[in-house]
């Protein structure tokens, strides 16, 4: 039996034990998700039945047992609920109009667990003033586990993994790009880049992180480089620049000095890191992606309103866009399941209306925080949660990351945290 199947089954069993032992509460579900984050993307159903992960399965179980928390929505969050229902409606219409109706309808199940997670996290933040610190602690521990995996892989090799085979991108020019507990080094890089900003977070004084915050941040930065992901590093840089601009205070000066010192050291040893060597091939990578993007955009134009149906890109490419492929080992043709760009993936599969609705859901809370900042309110803490979203947003241009629950979970967590700001749940930490 496949090792990942055993791990997935074990994770489900552990969830039921923990969940019922602690009283079937929403906090039990939320803490289990982050405590066992490395296992959350392991599959529990085949692709033909939605390809559900451990995260999906335990989210549906929790929604059934905690249905009152799901159904009761405060008026302040009604707009997000209506946007989500509108998004699901557009995806449903796209599935019905696609060439792969049954597959698309099953895959709609994949978009519901993130909503369940955010909904329950918002409820818990509202009810429990101490939950934020505990939840953030477990997220940071998950990041340390990812870093620990990389350290072990540096010592014993890439065979230290959950997976029977890894993505071919884990080696480049004979050098390793370390995937941690992911099967793909680029996914690992984006995860580490997003999570690194949480190490800078000092709830007691957002504008003055402690020395330990900078040390942990530096360790995470080194792990990003070992993962060898250009998109992750660029997203990391964008998030850091945003923090320097908007957080201000002593953080601005300290972060700039810290960044210059770390950058100088890394550049001095750049020949030792595969990431920096990969920038020399950036032009070739862009040329390849541009040809893929052009084909994907043509697919979008032909299916403008509702798209080709969720998770249908690979099947559609096989029939109608046969230039969307890679040559892998032994010159085997592998049709792409995403066009090397997350935004084009969503445009082609969700269509214009689904795409716009989804990004309204993601960006509305972010825009609201910037509005509060302009109005003179104290929202420094919120920018530490926006930075991972900015990081993800930029990396999404060259890497479709939302196929992995371990990226979805921190992204949804940050969205929930900044939605909480209008509810005045976290603003007290600014005072």
Segments (PLM) and residue ranges:
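Hydrophobic transmembrane alpha-helices and their immediate junctions
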Residues: 203, 208-213, 237-241, 245, ...
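Long extracytoplasmic/lumenal interhelical loops at the membrane interface
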Residues: 280-294, 298, 306-350
